[in-house]
C-alpha cells in the first residue's frame, strides 16, 4: 500500500512549487503509529520550534471515522486553552474534490501522562497537585462551552518534561446546546472501561451529565497517586465489582434511578459492602488530596463537584484563583449542525475542507466570497510530506536512526518558461539615470545571480543602487507563479503577500540563441500614490530624454525617479516580451546594467515574466 501511495504521489508532486509549505517542515522521526496513520516529530523552519505532524490515512473510508476527525479538528479550533492541545495548522490538500489523507500540525508534546506514571515512581505531592490542577482547568474550560470529552484517560493527556499537561483526542466529544436538556444521551459511547463512570456501565442511565468527565479525572488522579489503574475491570460486571469494593454498595435511591433492569437487579442483589477509607487505600497521599478525590469519585453523579467547585477546594489554596481561571464562550449551534443530519462522504469532505481553510485565511476569504475555483488546484505541501512519511514508515522498523529524505531541489525545475499577463497598477519608474548605474552583485564564482558573467565591473557613483530585498527564491530558479489566479493576482500572492522578489532582472549573454531563454523576470516595486509614469519603449534608447528631463531628475526628491517621456509605442498587455541584452547595450548610454533597469520599467504594466534555469 505504501508503494502505491508513492506511485500515486509522484505525479502530483510535479505540480507542487516552492511557494507552498513544502519546505517549511523538516521531518525528524516517527513518534507514534496507529490504525489512523503516523505521527512524526518535525521542525518548523519558519519559527524554529518543534511540532508534531499527524498523518491520517484514508479519512473518508468510513463515515464514522471521518465524522470523528471532523469533530476533533473543529473542537480543537474552538477550544483554545493553555491546557488543551493546539492545532497549529492543517496542510492544504492538492485537490479539493479528491483528497484522502490529511496532515495536522500540532504543538509537540514529548510524552503522555500514561508514560509519565509508568516511568516515574517518585512523583512528589507537588507533582500530584499540579497535574490535577491542570486537568481540572482544562475540564472547566470545556464544560463552560458545554463540551463533554467522554474519553479522558492518561493516554489522552499529553505531557512535557516541565510537567505541562494538555488534554487531546476530542474524537468522542459532544456538545450540549441550550435548547436541549442539561442531561443528554448518546448511544455511541465507547470510552475506555477503566475510566468509565458507573452510570455508563451497562447503559445504566438513559441520560448523563458532564459529571462523567469528573469521574474520569478522579480515576486518573488516583492512578497518579498510586502508579497503577484504580479500576482495571475485565468486563462490565467486574468493573462494577471493583467500584463497589472501594466505594461500598450505592444508596437505595441511587439504585432506583438505574434504568437497565439487569443492572438494577445486580446492584439490588449485591451483598452489602462497606466503603474503604481513602487514607487506607492511599496511605502516602496528602489528606487534602484524598478528600477532594473522594468527592470526584462519588457513585451518584449528583454528588460529584463541577470542575469550578473542585478548583475552589482547599487542596489548591495558593495555587488556584477561580476568578482568574479562563472560561469559554458557548459554541454556536451552527458549528455542529452536521451532527443532526445524515451525511455522505462528499458532504464530510466538504466540511473537513472548510475546516482546513480556517488555517489559510486568504483562501478562506476566497471560498466564502465564492471566487474560489471549483477544482482547487492551489499549490500544496502534501506531496513533499507524503514522500517523507512513506520513507520513515518503511524504514522505522530497521535498527539505528532513520534519516529522513532531504528535498533535492529548492523548487521544481522546468525546461520551458512561459509568461503570463498579470494586470497590475501603474508603478513608478525606478530606472537608473545617467549619473547612477545599477551594479549586479556577483556570486561566489564570479558570475551574476543569473548564472552569467557579472556586470559589477561597471563603475558606480557614491550613491548605490536601490536597497536589495532578499529574494523569495535562489537565483536561476522560479520565484514567481506563471499560473493566473482569478482577477489577475498570482497564486503566490494568496500565500505570501509579504514576499518580495529580488529588485533586479536577469538577461542572457550575447551568445545565447535559444528563444526560450530570452525571457526575463521583472520584479515589481511597491506601488506609490503618484501620477503614472510613461513607459520606455524597447525600441527607443533612454537617450531620448531632454535636458529639461535631466533638470527634473536632479530636482526630484527621489534619487531614483525617472522623468516622464512621450509615449512612443504603446505595448499590448498580452504581448510576450523578450529583452535582447545586446541590443539594449548598443542603444543605451547606460551600459548593460542600465539597460536591465530600463527593462524593468518597460515591463512595469505589462505583466510578470518568469525566468527558469535547469537545476
UniProtKB/Swiss-Prot annotation:
Q: What is its EC number?
A: 2.7.11.24
Q: What does this protein do?
A: Mitogen-activated protein kinase (MAPK) that is specifically regulated by PHS1 and MAPKKK20 and mediates signaling that regulates cortical microtubule functions, maybe through regulation of microtubule dynamic instability.
GN (gene name): MPK18
| Domain note | The TXY motif contains the threonine and tyrosine residues whose phosphorylation activates the MAP kinases.
Documented activity regulation: Activated by threonine and tyrosine phosphorylation. Inactivated by phosphatase PHS1.
Q: List residues binding ATP.
A: 31-39, 54
What is the recorded name of this protein? Mitogen-activated protein kinase 18
**Short motif TXY, span:** 187-189
- Mark out the compositionally biased spans (Pro residues): 464-473
Localization (cell): Nucleus; Cytoplasm
Give me the stretches of Polar residues compositional bias.
Answer: 445-459, 510-522, 532-544
Phosphothreonine-modified residues are 187, 192
Q: Which organism is it from?
A: Arabidopsis thaliana
Chief subcellular location: nucleus
Amino acid at each position: 500500500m505504501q508503494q502505491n501511495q508513492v506511485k500515486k504521489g509522484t505525479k502530483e508532486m510535479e505540480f507542487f512549487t516552492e511557494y507552498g509549505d513544502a519546505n517549511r517542515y523538516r521531518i525528524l522521526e516517527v513518534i507514534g503509529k496507529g490504525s489512523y496513520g503516523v505521527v512524526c516529530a518535525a521542525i518548523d523552519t519558519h519559527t524554529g520550534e518543534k511540532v508534531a505532524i499527524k498523518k491520517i490515512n484514508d479519512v473518508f473510508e468510513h463515515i464514522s471515522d471521518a465524522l470523528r476527525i471532523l469533530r476533533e479538528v473543529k473542537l480543537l479550533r474552538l477550544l483554545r486553552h493553555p491546557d488543551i492541545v493546539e492545532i497549529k495548522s492543517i496542510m492544504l490538500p492538492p485537490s479539493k474534490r479528491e483528497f484522502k489523507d490529511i496532515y495536522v500540525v500540532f504543538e509537540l508534546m514529548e510524552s503522555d501522562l500514561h508514560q509519565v506514571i509508568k516511568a516515574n515512581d517518585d512523583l512528589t505531592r507537588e507533582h500530584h497537585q499540579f497535574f490535577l490542577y491542570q486537568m481540572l482547568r482544562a475540564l472547566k474550560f470545556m464544560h463552560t462551552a458545554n463540551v463533554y470529552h467522554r474519553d479522558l484517560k492518561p493516554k489522552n493527556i499529553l505531557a512535557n518534561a516541565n510537567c505541562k499537561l494538555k488534554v487531546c483526542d476530542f474524537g468522542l466529544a459532544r456538545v450540549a446546546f441550550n435548547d436541549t436538556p442539561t442531561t443528554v444521551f448518546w448511544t455511541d459511547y465507547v470510552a475506555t472501561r477503566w475510566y468509565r463512570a458507573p452510570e455508563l456501565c451497562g447503559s445504566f442511565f438513559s441520560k448523563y451529565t458532564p459529571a462523567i468527565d469528573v469521574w474520569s479525572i478522579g480515576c486518573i488522579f488516583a492512578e497518579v497517586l498510586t502508579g497503577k489503574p484504580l479500576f482495571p475491570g475485565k468486563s462490565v460486571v467486574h468493573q462494577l465489582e471493583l467500584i463497589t469494593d472501594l466505594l461500598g454498595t450505592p444508596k437505595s435511591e441511587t439504585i432506583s434511578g438505574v434504568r437497565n433492569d439487569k443492572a438494577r437487579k445486580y446492584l439490588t442483589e449485591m451483598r452489602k459492602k462497606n466503603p474503604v477509607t481513602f487514607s487506607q487505600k492511599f496511605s502516602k497521599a496528602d489528606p487534602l488530596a484524598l478528600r477532594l478525590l473522594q468527592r470526584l469519585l462519588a457513585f451518584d453523579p449528583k454528588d460529584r463537584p463541577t470542575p469550578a467547585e473542585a478548583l475552589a477546594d482547599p487542596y489548591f489554596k495558593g495555587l488556584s484563583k477561580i476568578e482568574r481561571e479562563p472560561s469559554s464562550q458557548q459554541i454556536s449551534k451552527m458549528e455542529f449542525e452536521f451532527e443532526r443530519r445524515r451525511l455522505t462522504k462528499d458532504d464530510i469532505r466538504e466540511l473537513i475542507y472548510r475546516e482546513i481553510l480556517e488555517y489559510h485565511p486568504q483562501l478562506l476569504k476566497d471560498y466564502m466570497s465564492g471566487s474560489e475555483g471549483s477544482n482547487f488546484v492551489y499549490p500544496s505541501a502534501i506531496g513533499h510530506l507524503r514522500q517523507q512519511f512513506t520513507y520513515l514508515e518503511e524504514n522505522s522498523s530497521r535498527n539505528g536512526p532513520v534519516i529522513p529524505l532531504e528535498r533535492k531541489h529548492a523548487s521544481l525545475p522546468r525546461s520551458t518558461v512561459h509568461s503570463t499577463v498579470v494586470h497590475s497598477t501603474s508603478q513608478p519608474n525606478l530606472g537608473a539615470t545617467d549619473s547612477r548605474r545599477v551594479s549586479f552583485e556577483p556570486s561566489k564564482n564570479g558570475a551574476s545571480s543569473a548564472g552569467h558573467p557579472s556586470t559589477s565591473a561597471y563603475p558606480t557613483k557614491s550613491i548605490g543602487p536601490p536597497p536589495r530585498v532578499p529574494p523569495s527564491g535562489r537565483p536561476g530558479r522560479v520565484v514567481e507563479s506563471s499560473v493566473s489566479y482569478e482577477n489577475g493576482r498570482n497564486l503566490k500572492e494568496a500565500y505570501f503577500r509579504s514576499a518580495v522578489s529580488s529588485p533586479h532582472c536577469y538577461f542572457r549573454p550575447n551568445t545565447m540563441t535559444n528563444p526560450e531563454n530570452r525571457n526575463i523576470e521583472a520584479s515589481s516595486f511597491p506601488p506609490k500614490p503618484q501620477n503614472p509614469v510613461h513607459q520606455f519603449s524597447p525600441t527607443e534608447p533612454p537617450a531620448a530624454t531632454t535636458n529639461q528631463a535631466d533638470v527634473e531628475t536632479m530636482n526630484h526628491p527621489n534619487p531614483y525617479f525617472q522623468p516622464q517621456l512621450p509615449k512612443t509605442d504603446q505595448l499590448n498587455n498580452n504581448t510576450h516580451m523578450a529583452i535582447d541584452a545586446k541590443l539594449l547595450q548598443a542603444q543605451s548610454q547606460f551600459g548593460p546594467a542600465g539597460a536591465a533597469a530600463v527593462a524593468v520599467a518597460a515591463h512595469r504594466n505589462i505583466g510578470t515574466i518568469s525566468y527558469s534555469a535547469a537545476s
